[in-house]
Swiss-Prot record:
Pathways per UniProt: Carbohydrate degradation; 2-deoxy-D-ribose 1-phosphate degradation; D-glyceraldehyde 3-phosphate and acetaldehyde from 2-deoxy-alpha-D-ribose 1-phosphate: step 2/2
Job description of the protein: Catalyzes a reversible aldol reaction between acetaldehyde and D-glyceraldehyde 3-phosphate to generate 2-deoxy-D-ribose 5-phosphate.
UniProt source species: Clostridium kluyveri (strain ATCC 8527 / DSM 555 / NBRC 12016 / NCIMB 10680 / K1)
Full protein name: Deoxyribose-phosphate aldolase
HAMAP family: DeoC_type1
Molecular functions per Gene Ontology: deoxyribose-phosphate aldolase activity
Any one annotated GO CC term: cytoplasm
Catalyzed chemical reaction(s): 2-deoxy-D-ribose 5-phosphate = D-glyceraldehyde 3-phosphate + acetaldehyde
Length: 218
Protein backbone atom coordinates (compact mmCIF):
# COMPACT_ATOMS: atom_id res chain seq x y z
CA UNK A 1 0.00 0.00 0.00
CA UNK A 2 1.49 3.36 -1.01
CA UNK A 3 1.66 6.41 1.25
CA UNK A 4 -1.21 8.32 -0.35
CA UNK A 5 -3.56 5.35 -0.22
CA UNK A 6 -2.75 4.69 3.43
CA UNK A 7 -3.00 8.37 4.39
CA UNK A 8 -6.57 8.49 3.04
CA UNK A 9 -7.49 5.81 5.61
CA UNK A 10 -6.10 7.66 8.64
CA UNK A 11 -7.84 10.05 11.04
CA UNK A 12 -4.92 12.18 12.28
CA UNK A 13 -5.80 12.38 15.96
CA UNK A 14 -5.15 14.71 18.89
CA UNK A 15 -7.59 14.21 21.76
CA UNK A 16 -5.36 14.89 24.76
CA UNK A 17 -7.06 17.17 27.31
CA UNK A 18 -4.02 19.46 27.33
CA UNK A 19 -3.98 19.92 23.53
CA UNK A 20 -3.56 23.62 22.74
CA UNK A 21 -4.38 25.78 19.74
CA UNK A 22 -0.84 25.73 18.35
CA UNK A 23 -0.89 21.93 18.38
CA UNK A 24 -4.21 21.92 16.52
CA UNK A 25 -2.73 24.23 13.86
CA UNK A 26 0.24 21.87 13.52
CA UNK A 27 -2.09 18.85 13.29
CA UNK A 28 -4.09 20.48 10.50
CA UNK A 29 -0.95 21.48 8.57
CA UNK A 30 0.31 17.90 8.81
CA UNK A 31 -3.05 16.56 7.62
CA UNK A 32 -2.91 18.85 4.59
CA UNK A 33 0.70 17.91 3.83
CA UNK A 34 0.15 14.15 4.06
CA UNK A 35 -3.43 14.00 2.80
CA UNK A 36 -4.99 12.31 5.81
CA UNK A 37 -8.72 11.51 5.74
CA UNK A 38 -9.46 13.79 8.67
CA UNK A 39 -8.23 15.41 11.83
CA UNK A 40 -9.91 13.99 14.93
CA UNK A 41 -10.02 16.62 17.66
CA UNK A 42 -11.93 17.69 20.74
CA UNK A 43 -15.16 19.66 20.12
CA UNK A 44 -13.82 23.03 21.29
CA UNK A 45 -11.42 23.13 18.32
CA UNK A 46 -13.88 22.12 15.59
CA UNK A 47 -14.43 25.56 14.12
CA UNK A 48 -10.74 26.43 14.25
CA UNK A 49 -9.89 23.23 12.37
CA UNK A 50 -12.70 23.85 9.89
CA UNK A 51 -11.29 27.29 9.08
CA UNK A 52 -7.78 25.88 8.68
CA UNK A 53 -8.90 23.03 6.41
CA UNK A 54 -11.63 24.80 4.43
CA UNK A 55 -11.39 24.06 0.71
CA UNK A 56 -9.29 20.91 1.19
CA UNK A 57 -10.23 17.23 1.13
CA UNK A 58 -9.32 16.80 4.81
CA UNK A 59 -12.43 16.39 6.97
CA UNK A 60 -13.00 17.59 10.52
CA UNK A 61 -13.87 14.74 12.87
CA UNK A 62 -14.79 15.23 16.52
CA UNK A 63 -15.89 13.15 19.49
CA UNK A 64 -19.20 13.06 21.36
CA UNK A 65 -19.94 11.63 24.80
CA UNK A 66 -16.21 11.17 25.07
CA UNK A 67 -14.54 9.23 26.57
CA UNK A 68 -17.05 7.52 28.90
CA UNK A 69 -20.22 7.45 26.80
CA UNK A 70 -22.24 7.99 29.97
CA UNK A 71 -23.82 11.34 29.08
CA UNK A 72 -27.55 11.43 28.36
CA UNK A 73 -28.81 11.05 24.79
CA UNK A 74 -29.95 14.67 24.83
CA UNK A 75 -26.45 15.83 25.76
CA UNK A 76 -24.78 13.71 23.08
CA UNK A 77 -27.22 14.91 20.43
CA UNK A 78 -26.68 18.56 21.41
CA UNK A 79 -22.90 18.06 21.22
CA UNK A 80 -23.17 16.44 17.79
CA UNK A 81 -25.49 19.05 16.27
CA UNK A 82 -23.36 21.88 17.62
CA UNK A 83 -20.20 20.24 16.21
CA UNK A 84 -21.76 19.82 12.77
CA UNK A 85 -22.95 23.42 12.80
CA UNK A 86 -19.37 24.47 13.54
CA UNK A 87 -17.88 22.48 10.67
CA UNK A 88 -17.52 18.83 11.68
CA UNK A 89 -18.36 16.31 8.98
CA UNK A 90 -17.57 13.20 11.02
CA UNK A 91 -18.77 12.37 14.55
CA UNK A 92 -17.21 9.65 16.71
CA UNK A 93 -19.72 8.96 19.50
CA UNK A 94 -19.25 6.64 22.48
CA UNK A 95 -22.04 4.20 23.35
CA UNK A 96 -23.39 3.92 26.87
CA UNK A 97 -21.24 0.93 27.82
CA UNK A 98 -22.86 0.51 31.23
CA UNK A 99 -26.33 0.29 29.72
CA UNK A 100 -25.14 -2.23 27.14
CA UNK A 101 -23.65 -4.40 29.89
CA UNK A 102 -26.91 -4.05 31.85
CA UNK A 103 -28.81 -5.51 28.91
CA UNK A 104 -30.59 -2.24 28.11
CA UNK A 105 -30.12 -2.70 24.38
CA UNK A 106 -33.13 -0.60 23.39
CA UNK A 107 -31.60 2.45 25.07
CA UNK A 108 -28.22 1.91 23.39
CA UNK A 109 -29.85 1.64 19.97
CA UNK A 110 -32.05 4.68 20.57
CA UNK A 111 -29.05 6.66 21.87
CA UNK A 112 -27.32 6.17 18.51
CA UNK A 113 -30.45 6.51 16.38
CA UNK A 114 -31.47 9.82 17.98
CA UNK A 115 -28.08 11.33 17.18
CA UNK A 116 -28.04 9.94 13.62
CA UNK A 117 -31.53 11.30 12.94
CA UNK A 118 -30.77 14.74 14.37
CA UNK A 119 -27.67 15.07 12.21
CA UNK A 120 -29.82 14.05 9.25
CA UNK A 121 -27.06 13.04 6.86
CA UNK A 122 -24.84 16.07 7.47
CA UNK A 123 -22.02 13.97 8.93
CA UNK A 124 -20.73 10.42 9.12
CA UNK A 125 -21.40 8.78 12.49
CA UNK A 126 -18.83 6.38 13.90
CA UNK A 127 -19.91 4.46 17.01
CA UNK A 128 -17.20 3.70 19.56
CA UNK A 129 -18.02 0.48 21.40
CA UNK A 130 -14.92 0.38 23.69
CA UNK A 131 -13.97 -3.23 22.96
CA UNK A 132 -11.65 -3.66 25.95
CA UNK A 133 -14.67 -3.42 28.29
CA UNK A 134 -16.82 -5.95 26.40
CA UNK A 135 -16.84 -9.69 25.87
CA UNK A 136 -17.20 -11.01 22.32
CA UNK A 137 -20.96 -11.44 22.58
CA UNK A 138 -21.35 -7.84 23.78
CA UNK A 139 -19.11 -6.59 20.96
CA UNK A 140 -21.33 -8.29 18.38
CA UNK A 141 -24.50 -6.94 20.03
CA UNK A 142 -23.06 -3.41 20.09
CA UNK A 143 -22.14 -3.62 16.41
CA UNK A 144 -25.58 -4.87 15.43
CA UNK A 145 -27.27 -2.12 17.45
CA UNK A 146 -25.13 0.48 15.65
CA UNK A 147 -26.12 -1.05 12.32
CA UNK A 148 -29.83 -1.00 13.22
CA UNK A 149 -29.54 2.60 14.40
CA UNK A 150 -28.20 3.82 11.05
CA UNK A 151 -24.57 4.56 11.92
CA UNK A 152 -21.89 4.51 9.22
CA UNK A 153 -18.95 3.00 11.13
CA UNK A 154 -18.24 1.03 14.27
CA UNK A 155 -15.03 1.96 16.06
CA UNK A 156 -13.02 -0.14 18.49
CA UNK A 157 -11.84 2.25 21.18
CA UNK A 158 -11.52 5.70 22.66
CA UNK A 159 -7.82 5.20 23.39
CA UNK A 160 -8.51 6.37 26.95
CA UNK A 161 -9.20 2.97 28.52
CA UNK A 162 -7.27 -0.17 29.42
CA UNK A 163 -6.31 -1.10 25.87
CA UNK A 164 -7.04 -0.23 22.27
CA UNK A 165 -7.65 -2.01 19.00
CA UNK A 166 -6.75 -5.62 18.29
CA UNK A 167 -6.91 -7.29 14.89
CA UNK A 168 -9.12 -9.99 16.41
CA UNK A 169 -11.69 -7.40 17.51
CA UNK A 170 -11.56 -5.67 14.13
CA UNK A 171 -12.24 -8.98 12.37
CA UNK A 172 -15.12 -9.75 14.75
CA UNK A 173 -16.65 -6.32 14.19
CA UNK A 174 -16.19 -6.53 10.43
CA UNK A 175 -18.01 -9.86 10.34
CA UNK A 176 -20.84 -8.37 12.43
CA UNK A 177 -21.49 -5.29 10.27
CA UNK A 178 -20.15 -5.91 6.77
CA UNK A 179 -21.10 -4.85 4.13
CA UNK A 180 -23.49 -2.24 5.58
CA UNK A 181 -21.05 -0.49 7.93
CA UNK A 182 -17.31 0.06 7.98
CA UNK A 183 -14.86 -0.47 10.84
CA UNK A 184 -12.49 2.06 12.37
CA UNK A 185 -9.58 0.74 14.43
CA UNK A 186 -8.23 3.09 17.08
CA UNK A 187 -6.07 2.97 20.19
CA UNK A 188 -2.48 1.76 20.36
CA UNK A 189 -1.84 1.82 16.60
CA UNK A 190 1.67 3.26 16.43
CA UNK A 191 3.50 1.59 13.53
CA UNK A 192 2.99 0.85 9.84
CA UNK A 193 2.81 -2.85 10.72
CA UNK A 194 0.07 -2.16 13.30
CA UNK A 195 -1.97 -0.24 10.73
CA UNK A 196 -1.63 -2.86 7.99
CA UNK A 197 -2.60 -5.58 10.44
CA UNK A 198 -5.84 -3.71 11.24
CA UNK A 199 -6.58 -3.04 7.57
CA UNK A 200 -6.03 -6.70 6.69
CA UNK A 201 -8.47 -7.63 9.48
CA UNK A 202 -11.17 -5.43 7.93
CA UNK A 203 -10.60 -1.83 9.05
CA UNK A 204 -11.40 0.90 6.51
CA UNK A 205 -10.21 3.70 8.78
CA UNK A 206 -7.40 4.02 11.31
CA UNK A 207 -7.40 6.46 14.22
CA UNK A 208 -3.87 7.37 15.29
CA UNK A 209 -1.79 10.11 16.84
CA UNK A 210 1.35 8.49 15.38
CA UNK A 211 0.08 8.97 11.83
CA UNK A 212 3.29 10.40 10.37
CA UNK A 213 5.42 7.61 11.83
CA UNK A 214 2.95 5.12 10.38
CA UNK A 215 3.09 6.71 6.91
CA UNK A 216 6.89 6.88 6.98
CA UNK A 217 7.09 3.25 8.17
CA UNK A 218 9.07 4.24 11.26
Amino acid sequence: MDKKELAKMIDHTLLKPEANYEQIVKLCKEALEYGFASVCINPCYVNAAYQLLKGSDVKVCTVVGFPLGAATSETKTFEAVQAVNRGASEIDMVINVGYLKSGNHDYVEEDIKTLVNKINGRALVKVIIETCLLNDEEKIIACKLAKKAGAHFVKTSTGFNMSGATSEDVALMYDAVSPNLKVKASGGIRTYEDAIKMINAGASRIGASSSIKIINKK
